[in-house]
Amino acid sequence: MFIATTNYVPGMEVVEYKGLATGEVVAGINVIKDIGAGIRNLFGGRVQGYEDEIIQARAEVLKELEARAAEMGANAVIGVRIDFDPIGGDGNNMLLVTVTGTAVVVR
């Protein structure tokens, strides 16, 4: 499965549009990581725990997108966009990761 942020697949032609393909993942952020993040925020630097959660959530949502596109009969997804949105409020550190794209058949 080819997944691209562009609206085409280099060297290939879109022969059929299958429709919108999506994926969603809600990732929880650990309280211990929050403490580490607060300390790092005071002194500067990267927060590896959060970065790892984001990387994992992105990988999961792309897998979901690929599976849904395959169910539609597509062999590629173009125009892909990934969004990260905090949800929960009141200290409930959760992250909604969504991905959308157009499922297509390319040759």
Regions found by a protein language model. Name each.
Residues 21, 34-81:
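Short, well-ordered alpha-helical segments
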Residues 1-33, 71-75, 86-107:
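N-terminal presequence-like segments and the immediate start of the first folded domain
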